[in-house]
Curated annotation (Swiss-Prot):
Gene Ontology BP term (one): maturation of SSU-rRNA
Name of the molecule in the record: Small ribosomal subunit protein eS28
UniProt lineage: Archaea, Methanobacteriati, Methanobacteriota, Stenosarchaea group, Halobacteria
Family of this protein: Belongs to the eukaryotic ribosomal protein eS28 family.
Alphabetically ordered keywords of this record: Ribonucleoprotein, Ribosomal protein
A Pfam family reported for this protein in Swiss-Prot or TrEMBL: Ribosomal_S28e
InterPro entries tied to this protein: NA-bd_OB-fold, Ribosomal_eS28
Keyword Ribosomal protein assigned: yes
């Protein structure tokens, strides 16, 4: 996949809150992010992210329809 394909297929989203760690060993972070463009602009969704992130970072999402399950599990 080239950089041009990635740019046209993805949607940017800004991290507004870090909810907590998730995954079997705490390797992923669950974050709330606001969609910045496209048909879902302004919508806030929950996603699981690998790697170091902090509030204000911008993610490139391939899909904006799915939300991550909540961490609580109860």
């Amino acid at each position: 996949m080239s950089a041009e394909e990635t740019a046209s297929d993805s949607t940017s989203a800004e991290i507004i809150e870090i909810v907590g760690k998730t995954g079997m060993h705490g390797e992923a972070m669950q974050v709330k992010c606001r969609i910045r463009e496209g048909s879902n602009q302004g919508r806030i969704i929950t996603r699981n992210v690998l790697g170091p992130v902090r509030e204000g970072d911008v993610l490139q999402l391939r899909e904006t329809q799915r939300d991550a399950d909540s961490i609580g599990g109860q």
